[in-house]
């Protein structure tokens, strides 16, 4: 594939740092981009995605769908020669399963005493 057909992308993380730029074929899918981001993610960050499903990519204000190709996601103004397209990365970690809370039996519950005051 000729080099001029490749699309150069960089990915802006939540703290303003970048991953990339990398060159991709216009037929590469968003899912492939996410896998690359996860593998190249800086290990010193506080938030680290565990899988590609923890990441959302945004380009030109739109959340990109996994099945779309790079060519389908490019905005019309991205056709500038030799320009690097910046896509924003949002990390949404999968919710962890909450541990079931231990139910306190009525007999085990501590007794609470109440008092009331009456002002006459």
Curated annotation (Swiss-Prot):
Pfam families per the UniProt record, alphabetical: Rad60-SLD_2 (PF13881)
Residues linked to a lipid group, S-palmitoyl cysteine type: 115
Residue ranges the record assigns to the propeptide: 118-120
Record's note on what induces expression: Induced by pathogens, cycloheximide and ozone treatment.
Location in or out of the cell: Cell membrane
UniProt membrane topology term: Lipid-anchor
Residue span(s) of domain Ubiquitin-like: 7-73
Tissue specificity statement from the Swiss-Prot or TrEMBL entry: Ubiquitous.
Residues with lipid group (S-farnesyl cysteine): 117
Effect ascribed to mutating residue 117 to S: Loss of prenylation and membrane localization
A single GO cellular-component term on record: plasma membrane
InterPro entries: MUB (IPR017000), Ubiquitin-like_dom (IPR000626), Ubiquitin-like_domsf (IPR029071), UBL3-like (IPR040015), UBL3-like_ubiquitin_dom (IPR039540)
Modified residues annotated as Cysteine methyl ester in this record: 117
Keywords carried by this UniProt record: Cell membrane, Lipoprotein, Membrane, Methylation, Palmitate, Prenylation
Role noted for this protein: May serve as docking site to facilitate the association of other proteins to the plasma membrane.
Misc note: Heat stable and remains soluble at temperatures exceeding 90 degrees Celsius.
PANTHER family in the cross-refs: MEMBRANE-ANCHORED UBIQUITIN-FOLD PROTEIN 4, UBIQUITIN-LIKE PROTEIN 3 HCG-1 PROTEIN
Protein name: Membrane-anchored ubiquitin-fold protein 4
Organism in which the protein naturally occurs: Arabidopsis thaliana (Mouse-ear cress)
Gene name of this polypeptide: MUB4
